Structures are given as C-alpha cells and as structure tokens.
Amino acid sequence: MKIMDCTLRDGANVLGNGFPRELTEMMLRGLVNNGVSIIEYGNAKGIGAYEVSGAVAPLTDDEYLELASPLIGKAEIGMFYTAKRFLPDSAKKAADHGLSFLRVGADAGDYKISERVIRSVKDSGIKSFYSLMKAYLLTPKELAKEAEILENMGVDEITIMDSAGFMQPEQAREYVVAMKEKVHIPVGFHGHNNLGLAL
C-alpha cells in the first residue's frame, strides 16, 4: 500500500485555494524528509484553475512549480488537474518543471471530457493519475466499468474519491473490490473524515 499526501492541495480548500510560499516550502521539505513518497500540492482547484476560472491562490502555478524544484527526484511530486479546466500547455509546463504526475479529476460518469486531458499529460511524458470525483454517483460496478475505459485511455493509477465523505468502510470496500476486478493499474481511495471513522 502507498499513501499520497494531498494536504498541500486538498487541505488548501479550507484556506481558500492554496497555501502561502513559506508554509508550502516548509511542508514539502517536511514530507520529503519524513519519507512520504507521493505528494500533491499547488492550487486547491488544480493547475490552470486561476486562468480558467479565476481561482486565486497565494502563488501562481509557475511560482508553485518553481518552489518545488529543489525537491524534484526526492519524491513523486505532482498537482491536481481538473478536466473542466483544461489548458493545452498545463501538462508541458508541469513536465518541464520536473513533476512526476498530474492527477486528472472529473465527476464519476464524465470520463469523456477527460480524454484530451489524459492524452495531454501522457504526451508530456509524465504519469496520468485519475480521480473519479463524487464516486458515489455511480454504483460500484458502473464505476469499475468507467475505470476500465480510463485505463484503456492510458491512465496510470486511479482513485475512487468520496468527495462528500459519507462512505462507510463496507461501502468503500465494495467500490475498491469491484474496481480491482476490472483494472490492472493501482487503485486508490480518497476519503474525507466527515463521519469521524478515520484511524
């Protein structure tokens, strides 16, 4: 099992759309120095979010990308990439700065809008992770079928995202088991502790 720490991205939703420079640098160093192997950071709404939808963060995408440069190669470092906020140069920009991955995100059932985004990420030479946001919009079997389609599009790893944070452990298990039976790529689970069930 691997753990992705996305505090510096998803956690930034609490503050607005991102953490300031000093805190981002400090947390990135701390995560890397403590052996966290996969880290997602940057604008909470994803790379390109400011240009596409005005999601203002303390730093621009370029500034977030540059501040991580001393840590490139010491962990898998990447950013979120909402499919609805596609910009043709986002993936190349991420790759040019040494990021390991972009995690494409779209609501469950919306895989068709993600194809060009996934292709752009893959063409840039970095990994395309994928988050099935609001996974509960589909049944476990329906979501697993969508994951199979996404795997065929070239996705390297896929995440079941419980965006509302209401899934109980058995429900989460059903989604994971159904998906593992359909795909050959790693399957992840992204939850929120709204029910107080986290360990």
Question: What annotation goes with each model-predicted range?
Answer:
Residues 33-36, 99, 155, 184:
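A structural motif
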Residues 88-94, 138-150, 195-199:
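Catalytic cores of alpha/beta
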